[in-house]
Amino acid sequence: MKYAVGAILDKFSVKSFDNMLFFGEVNQSAKWFFEKSGVWVDCESPAENTERVHFLKSKDLSSLPTYDFVVFANDFKLFGRGNEDETLKNLLTDGGRAIFISTTEPLPDNIKSVLKSFSFDVETDGEVKVLSCVKND
């Protein structure tokens, strides 16, 4: 990834990791950031840590709880099963935020469709897209 995940999260003051879900590859800069924050878990063994941060490469998300922060990095196809839009609706709650870091492709149409029901600010830094979302009434 061209930009450090940790630097992006820090820039947007994502400092509370009590309810956070991370999708995507975890590179060394991201690993360092989460280790420094005291919340690093092995992305290959998410079941071993039920506390604050879950790193998932692929998983059935239907039974997951709600997360305040959802971070998507690089690949929006990690959901599988073609239910990305419903999953995003379930993960984003009123007051929730989602940060999308995409260096490989634009946001898929079904994700854009979900985001139409949210107010969001978009900042672009090179190839990185960051959206802070709040559900509309």
Provide a role label for each language-model segment.
Residues 1-18, 29:
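Conserved alpha-helix/loop element of class I SAM-dependent methyltransferases that forms part
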Residues 26-39:
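Conserved SAM-binding loop of SAM-dependent methyltransferases across substrates and taxa
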Residues 56-71:
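A short acidic, Gly/Pro-enriched loop at the edge of an enzyme's catalytic core
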Residues 68-82:
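A short SAM/SAH-binding and catalytic strip from SAM-dependent methyltransferases
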Residues 81-97:
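A short glycine-rich, Lys/Arg-flanked "PGG" loop and its adjoining helix->strand segment in the class I
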Residues 105-118, 129:
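Short alpha-helix
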Residues 118-137:
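Core SAM-dependent methyltransferase catalytic element
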